[in-house]
Amino acid sequence: MILERVEIVGFRGINRLSLMLEQNNVLIGENAWGKSSLLDALTLLLSPELDLYHFVREDFWFPPGDIKGREHHLHIILTFRETQPGRHRVRRYRALEACWSPCEDDFHRIFYRLEGECGADGSVMTLRSFLNSDGQPLPVENINDQVRHLVRLMPVLRLRDARFMRRIRNGTVPNVPDVEVTARQLDFLARELATRPQNLTDGQIRQGLSAMVQLLEHYFSEQGAGQARHRLMRRRSQNEQRSWRYLDIINRMIDKPGSRSHRVILLGLFSTLLQAKGTLRLHKDARPLLLVEDPETRLHPIMLSVAWQLLNLLPLQRIATTNSGELLSLTPVEHVVRLVRESSRVAAWRLGPGGLSAEDGRRIAFHIRFNRASSLFARCWLLVEGETETWVINELARQCGHHFDAEGIKVIEFAQSGLKPLVKFARRMGIEWHVLVDGDEAGKKYAATVRSLLNNDREEKREHLTALPALDMEHFMYRQGFADVFHRVAQLPPNVPMNTRKIITKAIHRSSKPDLAIEVAMEAGRRGIDAVPPLFRKMFSRVVWLARGRAD
């Protein structure tokens, strides 16, 4: 069973949100998108530690700056789906038989709705119900008992940097039998791994597993509320770097086909660690939903990679939040969700499964995920043909007082990956875009591609396309008053009887296209803003306008 959809109306900082989820998702967005409100909602409503949550007055949304305009109604709908048609009949879910609803796609789902009503006297009422696929309440007896069973089967564990963990005041001393169980599980996993063909000694395996325990109980532990003296792994490895390397090898061993038993042991180890460190007790049938909050806050990128690989081995649904380009480079783009606060809602943008063809997906994975993962945080992409344009455009924008990084604008060259996949991807992810093309034959084809994507809408074309009235960037800048730079680099006198193309070719041979572009951009900087071609100034204003439209 997985949590398939979260719908929130009027809860804390979220006016309206509809979020589809898969087995693993990474959520990104700017600071005000409502991350804390979403994670709080899941943590409070599906917590294994607390009894059923009752809404309070502070849970109701109000318009920013207008606390008197606080809403009096909120509702949250959590949709759970069986992983395969027919799975709802297995023993684990039998107690929830009355809550399942058949759907047209042959899957059964549980629609769990919570409503909050705030009275004029400040009193708050919390209502719970299970719905059918048409949104009508099901005649379920003992709704609260059913909800408790649902939470027992799929509790939320919120894992975050141990520095920010919430201290549990009572029951911080771990139960000794649990500590012994953990030691036995570690020993068994070490013996299991030692029987497999690999190049680690028994001691190295144990050192790697020690790093695993250290990671699970320290770096990703909110439930780990015990004091330092109660930690299971008291002594840190003398050579921590080597331990992480061994853990990386162990991860890869467990990730191989036929290693399901090792994953089960790993899950048991993870569960026992959590229970040994606090008052938390998980049901034997529980398959927790992990909320991993900004895992990069305390991990070096290499360690982050190893830690993320370890979490990938746990057979559990996971929702992570991050501000790290490093983590995004480790995540398939179809698992990334961009959340953007708009005036009336928080919009969730995603590629989703099957969002791109296999070839386009491969191009995006290489061009964006592996080489420019941080561009997924951008508000607007300015797509240019190559490296020359990247150098010139960034520098000229700076001369005009536009700081692209601060505005959330990323200049991305598209010649290597193709224009169409990038535009399609940007649209699916809610990233604004603008294309700059040359005036040569290739540029005209790119312009035609943009127009076809915009259905030849003239107004849209004005917002999304700028075409150079010249063969390429070099010819354009030559005509815009920078001929002397080309002559200087080509080591030619100003009035030499030679056509423009030959002068530019000679200048490129004397340096290179990127170096020539930098020379032109630096000269523009010396001359001031008036030297920046009006075409570019107009384009910069449009791109900044697009970016700000998304940010507001």
Residues of each region from the PLM?
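Switch/communication elements of ASCE P-loop NTPase nucleotide-binding domains
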Residues: 1-27, 32-47, 245-371, 448, ...
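Flexible phosphate/Mg2+-sensing switch loops adjacent to catalytic phosphate-binding sites
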Residues: 47-72, 140-143, 275-285, 322, ...
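Electropositive, glycine-dotted interaction segments
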Residues: 85, 89-188
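Charge-patterned, long linear interaction tracts outside catalytic cores
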Residues: 238-244, 393, 398, 487-552
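RecA-like P-loop NTPase motor core
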Residues: 328-329, 334-442
